[in-house]
Amino acid sequence: MPFIPHTEEDVSAMLGAIGAASIEDLFDEIPPALKTGKLKDVPDGLPEMAVARLMQERASQDGFWSNFIGAGVYEHHIPAAIWQITTRGEFYSAYTPYQAEASQGTLQLIYEYQTMMTRLTGLDVSNASLYDGASALAEAVLMAVRSHKSSRRVLVPKTVHPVYRSVVVTTVRNQGIDLVELEYDPATGKTVLPSEPGAFAGLVIPQPNFFGVLEDVHTMTDWTHANGGLAIALVNPTTLAVLEAPGKWGTKGADIAVGEGQPLGAPMASGGPYFGFMCCRQDFVRQMPGRIVGRTVDLDGKPGFALTLQAREQHIRRSKATSNICTNQGLVVTAATQYMALLGPQGLAKVAAASHANTVALAEKLGAIPGVARAFASPCFHEVVLKLDDGTLKGTSAKDVLRALRAQGILGGLDISGWYPELGQAILVCVTETKTGADLDHYAQHLERILSKRREAPPCAYKN
């Protein structure tokens, strides 16, 4: 085996010391029938340089994709320094240490993360993170029911990400919680609030919603409080650099804010690892799941950091724990903290503004193509829903169009017609600050050619 630091003389000396003639003698108690021997279908090993060359050749076969898919995972530029710092040995762990106070550096980093998140959301307290955005929303629903005490009904708009809704349904299925789905206005894509909601523990307020549409968050928050519920903000953290923080929604502000932290420095990587964030008002801190790092002083009066309010956690009182999540996504939180620190408020605002500007520009270009129209006449952030069936494209599905775009190296968006059949053939398109004007023109030109081919001869595939 390569890279074993023992010479043949070292091996012989060690074997002689234990009375073995060869390394094979160390395994002579294993029956021959259980030994694999040489694997005939496995080729011999390659030198490191040859392996690197092979991997490079394999990777080059993927080509370059122009990505316009979002729906919860977004392609943002990540400065090289982020993961260079994050993967230093001092940080390279996925967990809060079990002897936490012995790792003051890790605790201070999480404390700084919590501080940044409370400033972004405008709320009082942040935890050390949860698994992802979907599980964070599910935990927020449970938290709202625990805090409200008099109702176990939670209102969840249909404009919340379908996968998030599915996770919430799975989480609360056997806990006696009633999830009430709210419809959206087909013209605006915004949530329709019921005139007589009855008693409920909380309302989930997505901003922006799954369609990319900006909801009337001030109205929704005040309506929730007027009806005795808690306002649960489900937000994209990038938007908080330019939009009103949840803590300032309406007259009193949202009570809980959650979301997916992936846009803050985590690469797109087959679904993870990412992290969920959760913040809340001070009134509800004892119902908040996950770990919380606090700042304190030691016996000598020196400042230090410690895990606080641990009685909420599973490893202290399992039967009364606020959650079955007893860890956090420490490594990805480290990257998010570096990302927010390096970009600062102005940098985050530039990312958000550039993403929005690119989305507006692409929506205008694509909306000018015959057969393409925006599904909703409402302001959006960096995602927009486009409808592809105007009557001239009979027999053409969103799936077919996206496949044709993919043949040209363009990941044109997400087909949402399965989740929202009432929209017809519709795709959710996302644009971030990583796209240039040439990228937008490239997409628009190919989409127009694809649709013109479909209009002339729907059965034919688009080839060039």
Curated annotation (Swiss-Prot):
<dbReference type="InterPro" id="IPR015421">
    <property type="entry name" value="PyrdxlP-dep_Trfase_major"/>
</dbReference>
<dbReference type="GO" id="GO:0004375">
    <property type="term" value="F:glycine dehydrogenase (decarboxylating) activity"/>
</dbReference>
<dbReference type="InterPro" id="IPR049315">
    <property type="entry name" value="GDC-P_N"/>
</dbReference>
<dbReference type="Pfam" id="PF02347">
    <property type="entry name" value="GDC-P"/>
</dbReference>
<comment type="function">
    <text>The glycine cleavage system catalyzes the degradation of glycine. The P protein binds the alpha-amino group of glycine through its pyridoxal phosphate cofactor; CO(2) is released and the remaining methylamine moiety is then transferred to the lipoamide cofactor of the H protein.</text>
</comment>
<dbReference type="InterPro" id="IPR015422">
    <property type="entry name" value="PyrdxlP-dep_Trfase_small"/>
</dbReference>
<comment type="similarity">
    <text>Belongs to the GcvP family. N-terminal subunit subfamily.</text>
</comment>
<dbReference type="InterPro" id="IPR020581">
    <property type="entry name" value="GDC_P"/>
</dbReference>
<comment type="subunit">
    <text>The glycine cleavage system is composed of four proteins: P, T, L and H. In this organism, the P 'protein' is a heterodimer of two subunits.</text>
</comment>
<protein>
    <recommendedName>
        <fullName>Probable glycine dehydrogenase (decarboxylating) subunit 1</fullName>
        <ecNumber>1.4.4.2</ecNumber>
    </recommendedName>
</protein>
<keyword id="KW-0560">Oxidoreductase</keyword>
<dbReference type="GO" id="GO:0019464">
    <property type="term" value="P:glycine decarboxylation via glycine cleavage system"/>
</dbReference>
<dbReference type="InterPro" id="IPR015424">
    <property type="entry name" value="PyrdxlP-dep_Trfase"/>
</dbReference>
<dbReference type="InterPro" id="IPR023010">
    <property type="entry name" value="GcvPA"/>
</dbReference>
<dbReference type="GO" id="GO:0009116">
    <property type="term" value="P:nucleoside metabolic process"/>
</dbReference>
